[in-house]
C-alpha cells in the first residue's frame, strides 16, 4: 500500500494561495482577447496585428516553459512563483501605459516570459506539499483557479466598454502586485524531512538544464507521457477550436448561442471534473499506486463516446449531454498529469518535465488549430475532425496503460513515488 505521510503545515493554505495565483495568471493573459474593439479604437492595428498579440505571447510562453520549469527545480519554488507573479503583474500594469502597437506587442512578449514560470513551479510546489493521498485533489483545486481566471477574462471587455481599456490592465496589475506581497509573507517551500519528496527534489547534485532534458528523454515512461500529451492535445484543440462552428452549422444556432453552448457547458463540467477526478484518484491511490493513471484512462474511455454522441446526434439536448460528459471526464487528464509525472520522473526534474510538456502543448495547439482550418478549406466536415479526435483519445488511453511507476536509473523506491 502506498505511503500516506502526514501533510506539512500550510499544505492547504498553499493550495488556496496558488488557486488565487492561477486565477490571476489566466485572467491577466486573456483579458486582451475580450476588448478588441476598444483596443483597436485607441491603438490603430489590423486584425492580423491584433491576433499577433496573442500569438507572440504563446510563442514566448511555450518556448520558455522548459527553462521556466528548470528554474523551479533549480531554485526555491516559492520564490520563483512570487517573482513570476510580481513581474507579470507589473507588466500587466505597464500594458495600460502603452500608446503604440509596438509597445503593446513588447508587453505581451514580456508577459509570456514572466507567466511561463508560474504553472510548472506552482504544480511542483503542490506536489511537494501533498505527497500522499491528497495530491490529485490539490492539483485539481489549483487548476480550478486557472479555469475561473479564464472565465473572468470577460471582465476586461466589460470594463473597456464602460470606461477605457487601460483601466482593466491597471486594476488587475495592481491586484497582482498586492497579492505578490501577500505571497511574500505566506508562501514557503515545505519543510524538509528525511525521505520525503521535497528533500529528494531539492537536495543532492545541482540541477542542470542539459542534464535534466537528457534524463527526461532517456526515460521510456516520459517519452510515452510526452507523446500521450501531444496526441491528447490534438483531440482537445479540435474540440476547443471547432465546436462552436459545428454547433452553429449542424444545429443552425445563432453564433452567440453556439459559442455559449460550446464553452459554458464544457467549462462548468470540467471545473467539476477536476475535483471529482482528483478526489477519486486520491482515494484509489490508498490501495493502488497507479490510480492517477487508471482514472485518466477511464475518463478518456468515457470522453470518447461522449464526443461521438455530440457529432452524430440530430438532437441538441443530447449533444449538450455529450458535451457535459466530455468536459467532466477530459478534465481528469489535466488534474492527473502532474501526479503521473511524480510517479515516473527523477524528483529533481519534475517542474522541468512539466515545462517540456507545456511547450509541446503550445506547439500542438497552434498546429492543430491551423490544420483544422486547412481541412475546413478542403471541405472536410467538422464532425470528421471530432471523430479523428475521438480516435486520438483511444490511442491516449492505451498509451497510458504502458506507463509504469518508477524512475529508471535512480535508487528511489517505487513506494516513495506516490500518487
Language-model-detected regions and their locations in the chain:
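Conserved MFS/SLC helix-loop-helix module at the cytosolic interface between two early adjacent transmembrane helices
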Residues: 63-99
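Juxtamembrane intracellular "pre-TM" segments in multi-pass secondary transporters
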Residues: 2-7, 191-226, 250
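Helix-loop-helix hairpin linking two adjacent transmembrane segments in secondary transporters
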Residues: 142, 146-189
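Residue-level signature of mid-helix packing/kink "hotspots" within the transmembrane helices
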Residues: 30, 58-66, 150-151, 267-275, ...
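Cytoplasmic helix-loop-helix junction between adjacent transmembrane helices
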Residues: 107-145
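Extracytoplasmic gate region of multi-pass secondary transporters
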Residues: 32-33, 220-275, 330, 334, ...
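Helix-breaking motifs and short loop linkers at transmembrane-helix boundaries and internal kinks
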Residues: 44, 76, 97-103, 131, ...
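Structural signature of the two symmetry-related core transmembrane helices
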Residues: 79-93, 291-307
Amino acid at each position: 500500500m502506498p505511503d500516506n505521510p502526514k501533510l506539512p503545515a500550510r499544505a492547504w493554505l498553499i493550495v488556496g494561495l496558488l488557486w488565487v495565483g492561477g486565477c490571476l495568471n489566466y485572467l491577466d493573459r486573456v483579458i486582451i482577447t475580450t476588448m478588441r474593439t476598444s483596443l483597436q479604437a485607441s491603438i490603430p492595428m489590423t486584425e492580423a496585428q491584433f491576433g499577433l498579440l496573442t500569438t507572440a505571447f504563446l510563442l514566448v510562453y511555450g518556448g520558455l516553459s522548459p527553462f521556466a520549469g528548470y528554474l523551479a527545480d533549480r531554485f526555491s519554488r516559492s520564490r520563483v512563483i512570487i517573482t513570476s507573479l510580481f513581474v507579470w503583474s507589473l507588466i500587466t500594469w505597464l500594458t495600460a501605459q502603452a500608446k503604440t502597437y509596438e509597445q503593446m506587442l513588447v508587453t505581451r512578449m514580456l508577459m509570456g516570459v514572466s507567466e511561463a514560470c508560474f504553472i510548472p513551479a506552482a504544480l511542483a510546489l503542490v506536489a511537494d506539499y501533498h505527497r500522499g493521498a491528497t495530491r490529485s485533489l490539490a492539483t485539481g483545486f489549483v487548476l480550478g483557479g486557472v479555469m475561473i481566471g479564464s472565465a473572468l477574462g470577460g471582465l476586461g471587455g466589460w470594463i473597456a466598454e464602460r470606461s477605457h481599456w487601460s483601466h482593466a490592465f491597471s486594476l488587475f496589475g495592481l491586484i497582482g502586485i498586492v497579492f505578490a506581497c501577500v505571497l511574500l509573507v505566506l508562501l514557503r517551500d515545505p519543510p524538509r524531512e528525511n525521505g520525503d519528496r521535497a528533500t529528494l527534489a531539492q537536495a543532492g547534485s545541482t540541477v542542470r538544464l542539459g542534464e535534466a532534458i537528457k534524463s527526461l528523454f532517456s526515460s521510456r515512461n516520459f517519452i510515452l507521457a510526452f507523446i500521450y500529451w501531444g496526441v491528447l492535445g490534438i483531440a482537445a484543440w479540435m474540440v476547443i477550436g471547432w465546436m462552436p462552428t459545428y454547433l452553429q452549422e449542424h444545429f443552425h444556432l445563432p453564433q452567440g448561442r453556439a459559442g455559449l453552448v460550446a464553452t459554458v457547458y464544457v467549462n462548468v463540467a470540467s471545473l467539476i471534473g477536476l475535483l471529482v477526478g482528483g478526489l477519486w484518484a486520491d482515494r484509489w491511490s490508498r490501495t493502488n499506486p497507479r490510480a492517477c493513471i487508471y482514472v485518466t484512462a477511464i475518463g478518456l474511455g468515457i470522453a470518447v463516446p461522449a464526443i461521438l454522441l455530440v457529432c452524430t446526434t440530430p438532437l441538441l439536448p443530447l449533444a449538450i449531454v455529450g458535451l457535459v460528459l466530455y468536459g467532466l471526464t477530459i478534465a481528469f487528464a489535466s488534474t492527473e498529469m502532474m501526479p503521473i509525472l511524480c510517479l515516473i520522473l527523477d524528483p529533481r526534474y519534475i517542474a522541468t518535465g512539466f515545462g517540456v510538456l507545456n511547450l509541446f502543448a503550445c506547439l500542438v495547439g497552434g498546429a492543430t488549430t491551423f490544420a483544422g482550418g486547412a481541412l475546413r478549406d478542403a471541405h472536410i466536415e467538422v464532425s470528421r475532425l471530432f471523430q479523428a479526435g475521438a480516435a486520438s483519445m483511444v490511442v491516449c488511453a492505451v498509451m497510458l496503460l504502458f506507463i509504469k511507476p518508477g524512475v529508471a536509473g535512480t535508487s528511489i523506491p517505487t513506494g516513495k513515488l506516490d500518487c
